[in-house]
Amino acid sequence: FNTVRLQAGSSFGTGFFYDFKIDDKIYPTIITNKHVVNNKEIEVISFHLHLSDGDKGSDENYKVTIKTKWYFHSSKDLCFCFINPVFERVKMETGKDVFYIGNDESILGSREKLEKLSALEEVTMVGYPIGLWDEKNNFPIFRRGYTASHPAFDFNDSGIGVVDMACFPGSSGSP
């Protein structure tokens, strides 16, 4: 309930929900890589959303195709879009809320937490490698791997860490 399979033209990849909190207000977004949305500020994307069944997700999915505005990081292959307008549209069209679980800053590792980790840690990637997914139930594929650089150190001053994992096209944007 945290990821979406994004399709932008002939390109596809993964996006994940992230809730920005500003002045006690939550702003839900989808974060992905720029190249997933073809490096275009405005892009038509398609994805399926789980609809709400009270306080949990239902087995009902809803396909959305929208033209959306992406906000790009100035130097990283990273972007986000505000998703609340999509949630409002889905509510208007179906009478149901979208069920999602958004990440937030609480999942980000503090310097102290990162320094306590070993250089070799098991990691999990959630996404849609080579287009694989459980289309009927709208669920992603889970992959496991390991850190290939120490999580506390900025690999080559690039602002990233390195993992050793079987990653395929479509995994881009995975959390």
Show the residue positions of the predicted features:
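A conserved glycine-rich beta-strand in the N-terminal activation segment of trypsin-fold
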Residues: 3-29
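Cytochrome P450 catalytic-core helices
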Residues: 32
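Serine endopeptidase catalytic core focused on the charge-relay Asp
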Residues: 1-12, 38-169, 173
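Histidine-centered active-site/metal-ligand motif
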Residues: 35
